[in-house]
Amino acid sequence: MESFSVFVNNVDSLVWSMVLVVLCLGVGLYLSIRLKFPQIRLMKEMIHLLMDKEESESGITPFQAFATTVGARVGMGNIAGVASAIFYGGPGSVFWMWMIAAIGAASAFVESALGQAYKVKNPDGEFSGGPAYYIEKGLKCKPYAILFAIVAFLGPGFLMPGVQINSLVTVFEEAFSVNKILVGAICCVILGIVVYGSIKRIAQIAELLAPAMCAVYILAAVIILGLNITKLPGILKMIIQSAFGVHALLGGIVGSAVSWGVKRGIYSNEAGMGCGAIVSAAAECSHPAKQGLIQSFSIYVDTLFIGTATAMIVLLTGTFDVADAAGNLLISQTGGLESGIKWTQHALISTFGTWSGKALAIIIVLFVFTSMTGYCYQAESNIRYLTGNSKKAVAIARAVFLAASFLGAIVNADAVWAMGDIGYGLMAWANIIAIALLAPKAVEILRDYEKQKKSSKNPVFDPAKFGIKDETGAWNRKKDS
């Protein structure tokens, strides 16, 4: 097992080189400039669209797509992932997580709008789309599209699920002293019952759970903030100084702060990976820009709200350590407590008492549940693309997904996180380049949306106007929405 951990960590380092970090930041900034920072200037429109009740017969509603995506994004990357970023990159990694969220929201807009624009209607009446579709139809490069679809199955379908289950069984073992394998088995049985339902069923579950789990977790962070408000200025100062290498103790790991902040930021919000595009393509709406804006807002919910909540919980309570690249502790405050989910758990216990550790375990169930159902849909969507909607292939893909999930209860945390990083990294490599190349099309889509809005119209998308062939009738709407 040790040799396996060494192998996956070496692959992880290769995939997540500084080149990918710069690419994610650079493309996000490029798209923000090309689109004139829609993630800032159209914030009011995002909230309006989120509240709009748009009915759907063929797909899921825009809010369900938002809830499903938030459910998939808000997972262990926001809790255990943020904590590990602080351990390896210092508090400064939090600043770079904020930065990748701020500019990554533009990447989220582009991929989700493109996912909608190039979506197809399946024989069962539901929609499919995402990077594989806009790469094939937009860039007209079938081999590239197939490559992405393979990577996008391996990521959510095999490499990434173990992270969620590993964190879940760890927190349950800590809170209730129960066997990890037993918890993992029960979790996989429940997942099996759910994932064999349709996307509408997944969307309905996510719509109910996602807002509730976010609200409870943020409330806990707000209470901790209130109890430690006098420490806040010092913590914010440490974050900024560490981010730019001017902190007395942490100045030598500024590179780690940037790389781990971007790495865990993308792990938590998935901006630029294409995951959000896959789910948003399943929504039925009158214009692709609507889903683009809604998915941009989900980045804020994920990183700026949930990710920041975790950072404040561990930093304000002093439940964190920081290590350099060689593993030497630069800051040691936890008494050797393993970084990750246990930091958050012990921070809550130190504030609210032992019951809060058990409460966190229950909240983690919700985070993991919605993340895993989102992963399953993303993997399944790409299998459908590769096999032409083969029911047998989908059934096999679901079985692989459940088996990979159970491995998370068996394999050590270090190896599981490295596998997850590889999955996210490969998807980022494949998708970031594609959305940069398709930026002009995204600019046209947003301009069309804003032009119609200025004419006091409910924007309606005409794919022919953009040179997009709607061969399956995905945009043949029976009614305006």
Where are these regions (language model features)?
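Alpha-helical membrane segments and immediately flanking helix-loop junctions
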Residues: 56-88, 114-132, 136, 143, ...
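Transmembrane helix-loop junctions in multi-pass membrane proteins
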Residues: 3-4, 35-39, 78-82, 91, ...
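Helix-loop-helix module between adjacent transmembrane segments
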Residues: 27-32, 100-125, 131-195, 363-373
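Membrane-interface loop-to-helix entry segments
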Residues: 23-30, 34-47, 166-172, 179-187, ...
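Selective recognition of specific alpha-helical transmembrane segments in multi-pass small-molecule
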Residues: 103-111, 185-199, 210-230, 263-266, ...
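N-terminal alpha-helical transmembrane segments of multi-pass membrane transport
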Residues: 1-76, 86-93, 104, 436-481
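Flexible loop linkers connecting adjacent transmembrane helices
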Residues: 37-62, 84-86, 90-91, 98, ...
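Extracellular/periplasmic helix-exit of transmembrane alpha-helices
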Residues: 32, 111-119, 222-238, 246, ...
